[in-house]
Amino acid sequence: MSEFKRIPPEHAQALREQGAVVVDIRDQPTYAAGHITGAQHVDNVNIADFIRAADLDAPVIVACYHGNSSQSAAAYLVSQGFSDVYSLDGGFELWRTTYPAEISSGNSQ
């Protein structure tokens, strides 16, 4: 894949069930208040560490607030060599109404 794909929550959930990595690019306090279960918080401070440790061929879903900022972040990951990248349409706001049982809080990643 040379570009990322925009996907709805249902497609993202199917990918999660197959082991996709979810990264949440919202600010740390917002992430801690509630995020997709299993999502890793990634920001400008830890993005280099995330990239170094990542399997570039594993599917990665990028989530933000509403699905806008995640598109830029997904494009950046593709530019860094990731081959299977998705942007969550509707972001966390749509996710939490679609899958309220798939939300965690706190800083655990």
From Swiss-Prot:
Family, per entry:
Belongs to the GlpE family.
The organism's place on the tree of life at top rank: Bacteria
An example GO CC term for this entry is:
cytoplasm
Record key words, sorted: Cytoplasm, Transferase
Q: Which organism is it from?
A: Pseudomonas fluorescens (strain SBW25)
Q: Return the Pfam families for the record.
A: Rhodanese (PF00581)
Keyword Transferase attributed: yes
What does the function comment of this entry state? Transferase that catalyzes the transfer of sulfur from thiosulfate to thiophilic acceptors such as cyanide or dithiols. May function in a CysM-independent thiosulfate assimilation pathway by catalyzing the conversion of thiosulfate to sulfite, which can then be used for L-cysteine biosynthesis.
Q: Which GO terms describe its molecular function?
A: thiosulfate-cyanide sulfurtransferase activity
Catalytic residue positions? C64
Q: EC number(s) of the enzyme?
A: 2.8.1.1
Instruction: Outline the extent of the Rhodanese domain.
Output: 16-104
UniProt subcellular location: Cytoplasm
- Entry protein name: Thiosulfate sulfurtransferase GlpE
PROSITE patterns, per database record: RHODANESE_3
Which reaction is the catalytic activity of this chain? thiosulfate + hydrogen cyanide = thiocyanate + sulfite + 2 H(+); thiosulfate + [thioredoxin]-dithiol = [thioredoxin]-disulfide + hydrogen sulfide + sulfite + 2 H(+)
Q: For this entry, list what GO says about its biological process.
A: glycerol metabolic process
Give the coiled coil ranges. Answer: none
Query: Which enzyme type, at the first EC level?
Result: transferase
